[in-house]
């Protein structure tokens, strides 16, 4: 066969140029336009979110000796801390935000070890009363820990060890941190298989014992282990609504307790302690059975509580579906209702989620019944990215295409307002509102929580 260079060149042009043109078109439109039917996000959008999350977590690191705010001193804890976000916001180590971000996969083994043992070392070693009259029970876990002197602050609203515990933030520490402490240990074991850390003594008490003590700190109903509170002994139900007053039986911390019970059961299985493993399985089962009976309304929404603030709660509802607490019938009912609320514009804005549907506001002046924040700001009606993945998971149970749409709106807003574009940009924000209200740029759980949840969404 005669070799003809011109013929070969022309053939290559006919083959390569159309492919090149198609590639340019695809790149011009962006990978994010093309989402596989069975994936919640396109490959391009998922990679964007992973990279952004890794960048945000890196910007949230406080290295030994580093200072991020003049009044807070240097990091003298002996290891890296991860605060709730980048730039100057929240200059301390918050247990909650850190624990909720672990499943992003971007926290190293040594970083985990340091923050787990630091949290354990600041667990309350006695019951005491603050100068403001709040009670810190034996075994309580800090809300946040100072970086300069390592002192635990058990209550929101302050960085002062001496001034903590004012009435507006409860008379006992928030309930969620105890269960998230369990999650920190569980995730460390899950990712390192280093079981010996559970036997390590911290100030004379093993880590495993500390986990059990913490688990039993929040007050609970005797019959079913549901977390409960009263006006007199009120604790914050969960730190992402710490400017609200919510009383009675509490849904969100009970969901966290359910998850922590399963995690303790699995840890005891690994330690060959079947009796304890069975005990915590039983506790989880009782909580799972009680939650819909106590909190579910006729539409399938879970209310935040049975006392003050007993309003349908999007975050509790979505997280309960995410943790497989509801039955199949309940799940489908709730999923359809959330889908309808999303389509009607009552649930989200630019892919971010309200605590309460706009149709469920307490009245014209406030979203929550009792709030320290003005309506449509912060936790009282602004929109948050933290629960977006859980809500997508819930909606996907009955309408996968709609879940994809919500996820796409979330990614599109992150792309549009990506802080890497310049100092006037700040996404991921902690929360925002159509009025123009924004709060705390470069916020970690806004990307870390959805990233983890998106990885668990499969098309039914």
Q: Which residues does each predicted region cover?
A:
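Active-site core of glycosidic bond-cleaving carbohydrate-active enzymes
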Residues: 48, 93-126, 202-212, 251-270, ...
């Amino acid at each position: 066969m005669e070799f003809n260079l011109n013929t070969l060149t022309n053939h290559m042009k006919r083959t390569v140029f159309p492919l090149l043109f198609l590639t340019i078109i695809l790149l011009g439109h962006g990978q994010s336009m093309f989402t596989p039917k069975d994936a919640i996000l396109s490959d391009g959008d998922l990679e964007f979110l992973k990279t952004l999350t890794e960048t945000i977590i890196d910007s949230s690191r406080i290295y030994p000796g580093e200072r991020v705010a003049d009044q807070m001193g240097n990091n003298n804890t002996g290891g890296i801390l991860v605060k709730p976000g980048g730039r100057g916001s929240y200059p301390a180590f918050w247990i909650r935000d850190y624990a909720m971000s672990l499943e992003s996969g971007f926290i190293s083994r040594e970083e985990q070890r340091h923050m787990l043992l630091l949290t354990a070392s600041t667990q309350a070693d006695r019951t005491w009363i603050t100068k403001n009259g709040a009670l810190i029970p034996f075994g309580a876990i800090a809300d946040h820990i100072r970086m300069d002197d390592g002192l635990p602050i058990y209550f929101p609203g302050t960085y002062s060890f001496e001034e903590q515990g004012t009435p507006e933030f409860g008379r006992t520490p928030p309930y969620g941190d105890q269960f998230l402490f369990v999650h920190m240990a569980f995730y460390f074991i899950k990712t390192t298989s280093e079981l010996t850390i559970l036997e390590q003594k911290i100030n004379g008490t093993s880590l495993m014992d500390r986990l059990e003590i913490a688990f039993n700190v929040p007050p609970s109903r005797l019959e079913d282990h549901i977390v409960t509170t009263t006006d007199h002994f009120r604790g914050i139900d969960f730190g992402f609504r710490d400017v609200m007053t919510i009383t009675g039986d509490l849904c969100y911390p009970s969901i966290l307790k359910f998850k922590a019970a399963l995690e303790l059961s699995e840890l005891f299985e690994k330690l060959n302690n079947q009796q304890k493993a069975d005990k915590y399985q039983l506790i989880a089962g009782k909580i799972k059975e009680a939650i819909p009976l106590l909190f579910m309304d006729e539409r399938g929404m879970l209310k935040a509580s049975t006392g003050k603030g007993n309003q349908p709660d999007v975050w509790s509802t979505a997280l309960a579906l995410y943790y497989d607490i509801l039955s199949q019938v309940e799940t489908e009912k709730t999923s359809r209702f959330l889908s309808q609320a999303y389509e009607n514009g009552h649930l989200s804005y630019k892919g971010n989620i309200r605590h309460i549907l706009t149709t469920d506001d307490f009245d014209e002046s406030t979203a929550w019944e009792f709030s320290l924040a003005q309506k449509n700001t912060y936790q009282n009606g602004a929109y948050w990215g933290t629960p977006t993945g859980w809500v997508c998971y819930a909606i996907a149970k009955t309408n996968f295409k709609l879940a994809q749409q919500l996820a796409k709106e979330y990614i599109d807003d992150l792309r549009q307002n990506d802080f890497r574009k310049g100092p006037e940009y700040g996404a991921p924000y902690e929360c925002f509102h159509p009025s123009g209200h924004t709060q705390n740029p470069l916020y970690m759980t806004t990307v870390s929580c959805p990233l983890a949840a998106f990885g668990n969404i499969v098309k039914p």
